[in-house]
Amino acid sequence: MSGRERLDEEDARILALETATIAGHTCKIAIVDPLPGGAPLAALRERLTARLPRVPRCCQCLAPSPSGAKKETALFWRDDDEFSIDAHVRPARTSAGGPTTRAELLDHVAAVMAGRLDRSRPLWAIDVVEELEDGGWAFVWTIHHCMCDGMTSMRWATELLWDEHPADASAPAAPAPKPPPANAVVEARWLRAAALAEHTPAAMVRELRPVEARSPFGGKIGTTRAVAFAHCGIDELRHVEKTAGDGVTLNDVLLAVVGGGIRRWLVDRHEGVHTARVKVPVSMHARTPDGDTSGNRDSFMFVDVPLAEPDPMRRLRAVHRETAARKRRGDPQTLYSVFEALGRVPALGRVATRLTMSPHEFTLNVSNVPGPKEPQSMFGARVRELYSLAEIAPRHALRVSAMSLASSMFIGFNADPVIVPAVDELAADVEASLAELLAVTGGEGL
């Protein structure tokens, strides 16, 4: 990848969402076992310098159109001739002295989420936290959402960050997939168009209907952020999934667990509990006709989670009925095609984006990105925790992001602390919600 490449419509819409109070980046936070000598800042810079050619986008910055147009749709990616690894991989300033505490790490991450990436440079940065209380270290990888979505960022982490094993390094690269014949692409588009015409009206009615209850996370978003972390075992989620049966999925369990945590948090604050409509991103990678595997390729579906239901298994089965119906009818695929088509006309794309982000459409966003299936290490030290955080949206003061690593699920919470106070208590309530499900399914002690 070299020269100039126009910022595509979907990524331009994401970039345009950034305002004085809403950032456009995501964060990945890795907490790593101790290394002799502490965090390897110099070695990480050296590793990235050697590997960045694998991900050319990370050496590119945004440049205006030669025509002088200022809109995001007129921007181009171009190689950064002044790229400096030291400007992108830097020591984090988290403590006045001594090791960084967990609270200080969370405060630093919150400040990063509230900040902005320098648009004159490639839109990513890594802050290295050189010493934690237990001797370990951490890094906070900030990357703008207009560069990549969650699935793509995990591929980039494999390419850029994790240790490579001899088998990985010696294995021949998989051949690039051959593009389908032109007539096959045309035929696929006609078939999609026919399916779209048939399914769109019903899908739009199901997905784009107003939320009746007032959102507990609504309100005017400010400039500060608070973050919190929770975690659980994949085997715990799988136990609940298998015990529930009837096609319940791990993601159904996650949504029910988050719903149960929100219920606890609201009840403790004497807030009303109603139905929370959750916006669930759905990856469309490998489903596009050209086999695209880069950038942003996300759709979504809305799932009603009955917070008023006190029985955790009934709540889980209600969530499953919602997700199963939407998947069976192909709602995420239909919505992706609709908004992809609208996005080709920038004005319509902006209207569509505002519609799907309206506080009248959903309560909060809960994502689940599959991370590495095997344990990972950096410079020989185990990566023991891996969290993801995504930005909140106008009048949506809470966002929940889950990411797996080997046998664990890590959940990140990003919030406006004025509207969502004590987000750390919400994280604890989500862990308690899973414990409740384990108790009723005989899974204690897993």
What is each PLM-predicted segment?
Residues 20-26:
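TRNA-binding/sensing appendages of the translation machinery
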